[in-house]
């Protein structure tokens, strides 16, 4: 305890003693040693020398670094000046060349190779007598243009029995002279001035500034070598053998057979030829049924071919057209305005060299990817089918032509467009719908009798001419029906028949599917809107698959309603054929008489 108290006293004493400690004495100028002999000038000079030495050493060290080979421009002041100084120029003007120097450089670079050979008149050399031939088979001749080149006197002895070429000057020409020494020693002399010669060896005829010596020349290159290489042969495109190639199909769309022109024989012989060709076409149509394969979905989804809409007019020559009987020959034509878009591409108006108007379906086959093969097959089927159809209610096919990557299909021009555009402009009354329906039935009957199914009957695919004639168009999905075995789901959903949607539950579908689509088309013309218009396409598919009929308004006439409901039978076996529907009262009614021009009665086509 005593020890602890003693330590506490000592620590307290230390703390108190710290306050009495005197601070360290500060150094002041008066305490510095006085140097009376101090010279400020000498001190400043010595310090300047030391500074210069240190600066020079730093500069010497900085020069030891390698010069920069790349520069980074950060936008600072003076960066470009440092780059110019490192390049040894004062500014950007030193990097430029004059216009005259540039033009001279271009002329020199383009004429170095070409003009060198133009200076030699090869045609004249062929007509001249060439000099004698040495043992190596090399023939040396002089050129008509003698450009003298400085040389040197070369004299050396060749082996025994050799032939040496000696150049002798006659006027302005230098001609080779072969001289054989009597004792077998060959002497080779060359004058100081020589001219370029034409050397012909192994099929080459090239200019050469070197005199060819047969044998016995010591040193250098032995024999003759032309100064330029023989150009390679022209490259040829490899033949297209791949069966899946788009170009292979494209080249076969417009066959190169002899163009069929109208014969000058009598009308009776023409009728006989037409009958024979018609029988051949029917036989080909039957054979096509076994070769057709299922095609892709609708054109809007799978076959949206591209086109150049900006090109309003262009002239295209028809390279290899094919023509049906009675069609005019189209040798040259011009593409006009865009009329619309079909299953495979854009449709334009065209005019031939004879002033005949027609429709041109332009198909591009380049950027289709995986869908190209399917669309090409679909297009090939349409062309083959159209070439066999000859009916007043079906669009007439007039031939094909190709131009680069595009295929052009020439069709009959129907001026008023589709029924879709027509009922959007006018209100179609029952009398007009009845007239149009009868013509549609005539075309369908012709197709079904031929064994074809259209598979896409709707107002957008039915065209109207100025005289009121209705024509079926867009046969991109049409198929040959054989034993009711069409099992693919094609067409637009709103016009599809139930058996087309429920193809798994049936063996396929045939011509009754077109009758269902016809009923939907008549309903569309009467109401001015598509069937199932209040549903989405997927919802419409489910409704149709379950057998739900589209709504038929009570405002329609009784004959029109009965005709539509007769077509829209869920069971395809209960639907009438096209021939039976032609006897229906709706299509057999007479047209009401339109009032005379003075009565002022409205046209039945005019929308009120």
Curated annotation (Swiss-Prot):
Locate the region Regulatory region: 1-325
The known PTMs are summarized as: Phosphorylated by CRLK1 in response to cold.
Instruction: Give the subcellular location.
Output: Cell membrane; Endosome
Q: Which reaction does it catalyse?
A: L-seryl-[protein] + ATP = O-phospho-L-seryl-[protein] + ADP + H(+); L-threonyl-[protein] + ATP = O-phospho-L-threonyl-[protein] + ADP + H(+)
Give the GO terms filed under biological process for this record: cold acclimation; innate immune response; MAPK cascade; protein autophosphorylation; response to cold; response to L-glutamate; response to osmotic stress; response to salt stress
Q: Where is this region: Disordered?
A: 1-20, 228-247, 256-287
Instruction: Outline the segment boundaries, as ranges, of region: Binding with MPK4.
Output: 192-234
Please state the Enzyme Commission number of this protein: 2.7.11.25
Q: What is the stated purpose of this protein?
A: The MEKK1, MKK1/MKK2 and MPK4 function in a signaling pathway that modulates the expression of genes responding to biotic and abiotic stresses and also plays an important role in pathogen defense by negatively regulating innate immunity. Involved in the innate immune MAP kinase signaling cascade (MEKK1, MKK4/MKK5 and MPK3/MPK6) downstream of bacterial flagellin receptor FLS2. May be involved in the cold and salinity stress-mediated MAP kinase signaling cascade (MEKK1, MKK1/MKK2 and MPK4/MPK6). Activates by phosphorylation the downstream MKK2, MKK4 and MKK5 in a calcium-dependent manner.
Q: What is this protein called?
A: Mitogen-activated protein kinase kinase kinase 1
Origin species, per record, is Arabidopsis thaliana (Mouse-ear cress)
Gene transcribed to yield this protein: MEKK1
